[in-house]
């Protein structure tokens, strides 16, 4: 989970009047529990960051839904898709990414910020799934405003595949990025 926390702290995430699943940034842990009284949360804390999570189905995919609090204030929320389904193929994970991407692009104007490590298939969208399976590309799309930062990621590292959609207060994301930079 530590690696997941680090990954998510590097990922700038969003804010609206209801920023993440009926919650607004700045709300407390108590308000989360009042909003979801029937939900049994898993709790983790590291370096002063409290994460409350539970499993759900989002977009038809088994998902860990997590709420990140700092000083009892909601700073970000994220979806970790199909985290423990190790048998799911790269092709199926890419299809999941595209399905979630369609939903996001219907609501927001997402910007493609993908990183190509080998651009052999970059101009052939019919081969993107293969390029991903080969480790040639990490898919990333973002949406930014003064109040909102959304980041949707599909990446492959060694034998692990990560698919995360995150929403965060942009000031918090900026702060976390600055702190991570000072660690190097």
Predicted features along the sequence, with ranges:
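Short hydrophobic/aromatic-rich motifs at helix boundaries and adjacent loops
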Residues: 1-4, 72-73
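Sec-dependent N-terminal signal peptides
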Residues: 3-16
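Generic detector of short alpha-helix boundary/capping microenvironments
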Residues: 5-6, 20, 60, 92
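Cleaved targeting-peptide boundary
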Residues: 17-26
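A cross-family detector of function-defining hotspots
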Residues: 28-184
